[in-house]
């Protein structure tokens, strides 16, 4: 049985600089997954206001949509969702053995495509916010 050794806090803190593209893809995929789970609970809590009537639900939505920070968070949610979807498709292909030798390139392509989609969508989300 192998034993781990204590490298010290300074050495452990600097390990993130040694991450490869595959490790960053894993970290981002886990992070975006947790963000989406958190959003799901927020979404359900907003939808639950409809149980109190249409007026309460509509006033809740109009109140949230009038806040600029909510509009910015929607753009962030779009970025998180698009990256998670694209990286998930990339992982599916890698698991099937397609593109194994180009994993790094496909990860960077998913980042670029996420950026393009989000930048193209910004006017839709921020219209009337400011």
UniProtKB/Swiss-Prot annotation:
Disulfide bonds: none annotated. Pathway: Carbohydrate metabolism; tricarboxylic acid cycle. It is found in: Cell membrane. GO terms for molecular function: electron transfer activity; metal ion binding. Its cofactor is heme. Heme binds at residue 84. InterPro entries: SdhC_prok (IPR039023), SQR/QFR_C/D (IPR034804), Succ_DH_cytb556 (IPR014314), SuccDH_FuR_B_TM-su (IPR000701). Part of an enzyme complex containing four subunits: a flavoprotein, an iron-sulfur protein, plus two membrane-anchoring proteins, SdhC and SdhD. One of its GO terms (biological process) is tricarboxylic acid cycle. The chain crosses the membrane at residues 26-46, 72-93, 104-128. Residues 47-71 are periplasmic. It holds the Pfam family Sdh_cyt. The heme is bound between the two transmembrane subunits. Membrane-anchoring subunit of succinate dehydrogenase (SDH). GO terms for cellular component: plasma membrane. This is Succinate dehydrogenase hydrophobic membrane anchor subunit. It is a multi-pass membrane protein. It comes from the Archaea. Keywords: Cell membrane, Electron transport, Heme, Iron, Membrane, Metal-binding, Transmembrane, Transmembrane helix, Transport, Tricarboxylic acid cycle.
């Amino acid at each position: 049985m192998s034993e781990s050794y204590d490298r010290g806090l300074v050495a452990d803190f600097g390990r993130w600089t040694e991450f490869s593209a595959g490790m960053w893809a894993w970290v981002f995929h886990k992070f975006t997954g947790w963000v989406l789970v958190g959003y799901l609970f927020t979404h359900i809590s907003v939808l639950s206001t409809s149980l109190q009537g249409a007026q309460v639900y509509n006033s809740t939505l109009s109140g949230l949509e009038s806040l600029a920070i909510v509009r910015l968070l929607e753009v962030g949610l779009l970025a998180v969702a698009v990256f998670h979807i694209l990286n998930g498709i990339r992982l599916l292909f890698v698991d099937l053995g397609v593109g194994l030798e180009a994993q790094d390139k496909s990860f960077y392509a998913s980042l670029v495509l996420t950026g393009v989609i989000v930048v193209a969508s910004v006017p839709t989300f921020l219209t009337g916010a400011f």
